[in-house]
């Protein structure tokens, strides 16, 4: 009898520990929809299936088509599968889905000349801790990691020869608005830092990994 009581007590403690641990964690997922999945057969259904399968607490989306209609549609379809989300795009090609009720939504990090690539910011309180989430899709132009391979970083067309001079590649790369957007982001998050909010950013940065710059 004592052994059974001890076993039940251990199981009870284990369940409570696991439950407490689950409250301390959440999942984040980022997905580039690639032209809104319009170039993929049954792409719309595929998006819903992937989001349902991943079941993330917060989702960053980019390359959204018709955000005013898309987000409500996704929320409705996921609701049918027992998953409740909030969402916002500010009519941009990016957006956020969240199982956590947002404290606020903001369109931010707006760069003159590249206004269409502003960020969507959500602040949500999770277990008493406000957290700031940023969804972005940085400028795709002047993606100059193509230059050493012999292709134009904006048009994708083949050039007469590869360009491997580091200074020339970096100079061409800086013609994009990526640096300006990140500077705006760094400025924006200062208020988050001052208020003790953790910061999570997700999106398509249109910058290669350092692994892409190796000799091979």
Regions found by a protein language model. Give the residues of each.
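Metal-dependent phosphoesterases centered on the DNase I-like endonuclease/exonuclease/phosphatase
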Residues: 150-216
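Active-site flanking residues adjacent to catalytic metal/cofactor-binding acidic residues
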Residues: 31, 62, 136, 202-204
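Sec-dependent N-terminal signal peptides
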Residues: 4-14
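Short coil/turn segments at beta-strand junctions that form active-site/ligand-binding loops
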Residues: 25, 129-130, 195-198
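Acidic/histidine-rich helix-loop elements
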Residues: 30-44, 66, 141-177
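N-terminal, active-site-proximal structural segment of metallo-dependent hydrolase catalytic domains
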Residues: 2-3, 18-80
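Structured beta-strand-rich core segments of catalytic domains in phosphoester-bond hydrolases
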Residues: 62-152
